C-alpha cells in the first residue's frame, strides 16, 4: 500500500507497476506482488516476463578462432586468431566479444558489430541490449555495438583509480567495476536512455574485503557476484 499521487497515463502506471514488481521480486522470499496506490490497485498481471539469462555458456578462444564450447565440441563464431578473454551475450549466444591485440572486437553470427580501440586486459562485457563494454580509464569506459561506433560512458568515483574491467549484470541494471592499484571491486547503477543505450555508471559502492585484492569478478545472477 502506497500513499502518493497516481500516474495519469496508462503507460506511466504500467512502468510504475513494472519497476516495483521487478524490484521487490529480486528478494528470494518474494514471489508475488500486489500494489495499491492511494487505494487504487495497479494491474501487475500484464507485466512482461524477463528473458532467460544464460550465465553458464562456455565460450573459448584458440588458434581456430572464437566459439561456443559444448559437450559435442566447439561451434566457431569467429576466425580471429589473436583473441583472448572471450565473452558472450547473456541472451544471444551468437553475439561474442573478445580482446585482440589492438582493441576489443565483437561479432554476431560472424558479422562484425563493434570495435573498441585500446586495451581491456581482463576482457570485455556484453549486456542484454547488445552493447559491448571494453577499454576504460579512471573516469569512463568505451562502449560500442551501435551504428555510431564507440563512445565513452562516464563512471563515477574517478579518485578510486584506473578501471581494469567493467562487468554488466545479466539484467543490464548494474555494473561491477574493478579498479585501483589494489584492484578493489565496486557496484554501481547503469543509467540508460529509452533505447537501452548506456549513459553513465553512478552510485558506486565499494565491496568490503577482509584482506587481499580482487583478481577478477563475475555476476552469478542479476544481483549475485563472485570475486576471485
Regions found by a protein language model. Give the residues of each.
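Bimodal "functional hotspot" detector
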Residues: 1-228
